[in-house]
């Protein structure tokens, strides 16, 4: 039986989703808090996501430069298995997300102040 998320990990997922992050991406990011490398099936088992959801999340993480991929060929037949590995430490990923959210908040405050000034 695959290990599921702890209550702490589920809270992390909830907080990421509160920041308007898609569920699949939030669950995949939290998965990497305890796993530095894996294959898609392992992510699916632990996060309770389907393969297309995992693939979409992994594409985002790869575009950000947060993971590396490696194709593992199993013999001569069949599709290769993709192995994923963190390219940056998990805490760096989270700190980047926090900085981005702080920047959004700062930008929103400026816009709200501008709106307030225009209405006075």
Question: Which residues are covered by each model-predicted region?
Answer:
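Amphipathic alpha-helical dimerization/coiled-coil segments
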Residues: 88-120
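A short acidic, leucine-rich amphipathic alpha-helix
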Residues: 42-46, 61
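Key DNA-contact positions within bacterial/archaeal DNA-binding proteins
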Residues: 26, 52-53
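Glycine-centered, phosphate/nucleic-acid-interacting loop/turn motifs that mediate DNA/RNA or nucleotide
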Residues: 65-66
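Short, cationic-aromatic polyanion-contact patches
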Residues: 15-24, 39, 72-94
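Short amphipathic alpha-helical elements of helix-turn-helix/winged-helix folds
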Residues: 30-35
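Short alpha-helical segments that sit at the start of domains
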Residues: 2-26
């Amino acid at each position: 039986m695959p290990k599921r998320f702890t209550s702490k990990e589920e809270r992390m997922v909830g907080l990421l989703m509160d920041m308007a992050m898609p569920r699949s991406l939030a669950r995949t990011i939290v998965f990497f808090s305890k796993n530095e490398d894996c294959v898609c099936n392992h992510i699916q088992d632990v996060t309770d996501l389907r393969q297309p959801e995992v693939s979409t999340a992994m594409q985002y993480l790869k575009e950000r430069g947060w993971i590396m991929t490696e194709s593992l060929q199993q013999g001569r037949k069949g599709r290769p298995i993709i192995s994923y590995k963190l390219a940056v430490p998990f805490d760096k990923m989270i700190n980047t997300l926090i900085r981005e959210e702080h920047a959004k908040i700062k930008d929103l405050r400026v816009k709200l102040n501008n709106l307030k000034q225009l209405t006075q």
